[in-house]
Curated annotation (Swiss-Prot):
EC number in record: 2.7.7.6
Cofactor(s), by name: Zn(2+)
InterPro entries with a match to the protein in the record: RNA_pol_su_RPB10 (IPR023580), RNA_pol_suN_Zn-BS (IPR020789), RPABC5/Rpb10 (IPR000268)
Record-level GO BP terms: DNA-templated transcription
Predominant localisation class: cytoplasm
Enzyme class label: transferase
Record HAMAP family: RNApol_arch_Rpo10 (MF_00250)
A single GO molecular function term of this UniProt record: DNA-directed RNA polymerase activity
Manner of cofactor binding, per the entry note: Binds 1 zinc ion.
CC annotations in GO: cytoplasm; DNA-directed RNA polymerase complex
Protein's name according to its UniProt entry: DNA-directed RNA polymerase subunit Rpo10
Quaternary structure, from the entry: Part of the RNA polymerase complex.
Length: 68
């Protein structure tokens, strides 16, 4: 679905770095290094990035909207 604004567990704002994460991931960088550079330290916040589906630069939300 749509990337959450805050971490579900701790409530930290994580959406502010999502676009940079997505761009760097698309360029082939290692997800661990990206999260370290963006200073996403907590496991719960890192989980939010790792578990968010990105397939061919499309999010799950893009697929669902087609079936309105």
């Amino acid at each position: 679905m749509i990337f959450p604004i805050r971490c579900f567990s701790c409530g930290n704002v994580i959406s502010e770095v999502y676009e940079e994460y997505r761009t760097r991931l698309k360029n082939g960088e290692n997800p661990e290094e990206i999260l370290n550079d963006l200073e996403i330290k907590k496991y719960c916040c890192r989980r939010m990035f790792a578990s968010h589906r990105l397939d061919n630069d499309r999010e799950l939300f893009d697929d669902i909207v087609e079936y309105k």
